């Protein structure tokens, strides 16, 4: 069907099963990047038994929902990829690329969930669906999707918060969206693809001074309510960005052309990627981005990310608070839990009764294991949340919940813990004081075999089929072209739950505008086998964001992980962690003189513990 601008979209509608009533909710299920409309379609309730279990077209139709699935603008439809998916045909149109779908230049190109393009596509097609099926309840609409669809689900919630009607087109029914269920989503795409490690959220600086955030659970490209302005451009996730670009060019067509200051204008993704690949420096003195990176900051923050949308404050003031159930993965190295945590924190700061819940587990993109039992438990919780709010979002106390990551055996519903905020999942702190000093030149870490072995794309999942948990590639814990420190054995079992950080005093050599500090956290068993627990990165920008000396905190992606008694904690620090992150350009990168190195980790237990 033609979208709001005439671009063809490949659309399927699954009708509710007989005997499910006379008035029906509508749910839109949005596919991931490089996928198509078939992703959430199923001929059974069980589907894949995990992510799609009781969360697919068959399940919702059996419970009285209309289900709208369509192939996003710019992507081909190559047909069903799993035996449980129905053989719905691909849509075809004269301007679309074979074999069908929604890759239909010049307008039907990938826009990476632009708020004025794909977001409007969904609203338009939902309106067409409600027009075609009058028994759809126009006040009972939900949106859900994973990854690419998760990022859009958040943007759709922002759109509803900012307007009385979610879908409001001349000649089409007006619709209200009550619930969004983003799954392994982004909320700040600029930060998710290029994390800078700087705190976000509320500013700790006086009015008129440069922005400085205060909260590692809200780390972001910039301050909410801006176009991502406040923190420096971060470190590119090279393996993921390269893989996603290849996937997009294989399964679709990216938008290109001369960039526009308007969000609905052309977006030159290939040129932007080329500038990111060229690396630092990204900004000039006084915190001014170079012209191309300024485009990247504005587009990927303000146009493609829910965190920066003005609709949240508008909705707060108008009493419109769509219900949101956001699902993220501790071991998801593409869109870590921070993507849900920052929005939980922000929305609760606007309205403590905003109906937003977050659930985190060993799920999502690689390195995640995605255990079926955890997914089934999470989907049951998501279903109950959806049913409770589809007739109208219900403000009140909501929580953040976490399922532990395990190497052998799956966590169960009984293993989940909950708290009133992401930080409150932990009750105590484990501090590991190494008291070491080390010089890290720009090339430090380049020869470390664990860089490739631990990468989410090159290294695979956290486990392998032959040998339990993925382990360190090193034969010893000795440093390899970087810094490695190992703690004393833990006297008692300790459970990490939260983000945590590596910390050090630093001094950077003068005359260069940037530096990088990448960190990895390992669990070392008594036999010397080390298992990756988490990683993180911080980019120094000495053009006005960072001082030449001070104390740096490198936030980890986080985990819910138990260190048994007798195990030791290992910290790796380096400037190069390739291919996970783009290595810094040596000519413009400072050498870092580190001292007083330590780990600071949030613990589930209430006691504070310090070891060496």
Regions found by a protein language model. Give the residues of each.
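Accessory cap/linker subdomain of secreted extracellular hydrolases
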Residues: 39, 46, 50-54, 62, ...
């Amino acid at each position: 069907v033609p979208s709001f601008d005439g671009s063809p979209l490949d659309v399927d509608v699954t009708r509710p099963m007989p005997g499910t009533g006379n008035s029906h909710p509508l749910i839109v299920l949005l596919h991931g990047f490089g996928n198509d409309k078939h992703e959430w379609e199923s001929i059974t309730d069980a589907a894949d038994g995990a992510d799609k279990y009781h969360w697919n077209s068959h399940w919702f139709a059996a419970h009285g929902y209309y289900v709208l699935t369509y192939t996003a603008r710019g992507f081909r439809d190559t047909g069903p990829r799993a035996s449980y998916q129905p053989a719905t045909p691909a849509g075809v149109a004269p301007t679309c690329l074979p074999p069908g779908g929604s890759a239909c230049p010049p307008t039907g190109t990938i826009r990476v969930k632009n708020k004025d393009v794909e977001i409007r596509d969904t609203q338009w097609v939902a309106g067409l669906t409600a027009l075609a099926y009058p028994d759809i309840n126009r006040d009972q609409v939900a949106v859900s999707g994973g990854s690419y669809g998760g990022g859009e689900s958040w943007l759709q919630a922002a759109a509803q918060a900012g307007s009385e009607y979610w879908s409001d087109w001349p000649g089409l029914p007006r619709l209200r969206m009550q619930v969004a269920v983003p799954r392994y989503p982004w909320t700040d795409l600029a930060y998710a693809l290029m994390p800078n490690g700087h705190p976000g959220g509320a500013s700790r600086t006086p009015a008129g001074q440069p922005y400085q955030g205060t909260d590692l659970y809200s780390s972001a490209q910039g301050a909410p309510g801006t176009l991502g302005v406040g923190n420096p451009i971060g470190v590119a996730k090279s393996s993921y960005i390269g893989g996603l670009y290849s996937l997009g060019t294989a399964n679709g067509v990216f938008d290109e052309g001369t960039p526009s200051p308007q969000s609905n204008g052309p977006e030159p993704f290939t040129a932007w990627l080329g500038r990111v690949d060229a690396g630092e420096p990204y900004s000039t003195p006084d915190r001014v981005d170079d012209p191309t990176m300024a485009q990247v900051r504005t587009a990927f923050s303000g146009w493609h990310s829910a965190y920066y949308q003005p609709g949240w404050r508008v909705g707060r003031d108008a009493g419109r608070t769509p219900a949101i159930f956001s699902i993220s993965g501790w071991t998801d190295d593409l869109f870590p839990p921070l993507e849900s945590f920052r929005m939980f924190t922000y929305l609760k700061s606007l309205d403590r009764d905003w109906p937003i819940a977050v659930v985190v587990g060993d799920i999502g993109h690689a390195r995640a294991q995605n255990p079926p039992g955890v997914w089934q438990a999470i989907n049951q919780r998501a279903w109950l949340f959806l049913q409770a709010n589809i007739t109208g979002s219900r403000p009140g106390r909501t929580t953040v919940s976490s399922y532990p990551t395990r190497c052998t055996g799956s966590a169960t519903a009984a293993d989940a813990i909950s708290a009133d905020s992401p930080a409150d999942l932990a009750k105590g702190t484990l501090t590991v004081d190494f008291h070491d000093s080390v010089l890290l030149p720009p090339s430090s870490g380049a020869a470390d075999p664990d860089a490739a072995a631990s990468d989410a794309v090159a290294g695979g999942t956290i486990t392998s089929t032959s040998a339990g948990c993925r382990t360190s590639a090193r034969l010893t814990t000795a440093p390899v072209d970087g810094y490695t420190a190992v703690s004393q054995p833990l006297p008692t079992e300790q459970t990490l739950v939260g983000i945590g950080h590596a910390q050090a005093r630093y001094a950077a050599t003068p005359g260069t505008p940037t530096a990088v500090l990448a960190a990895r956290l390992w669990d070392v068993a008594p036999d010397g086998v080390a298992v990756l627990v988490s990683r993180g990165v911080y980019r120094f920008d000495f053009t006005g964001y960072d001082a030449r000396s001070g104390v740096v905190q490198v936030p980890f992606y986080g985990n819910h992980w138990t260190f048994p008694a007798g195990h030791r904690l290992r910290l790796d620090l380096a400037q190069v962690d390739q291919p996970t992150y783009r290595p810094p350009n040596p000519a413009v990168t400072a050498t870092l003189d580190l001292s007083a190195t330590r780990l600071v980790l949030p613990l589930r237990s209430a006691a504070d513990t310090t070891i060496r």
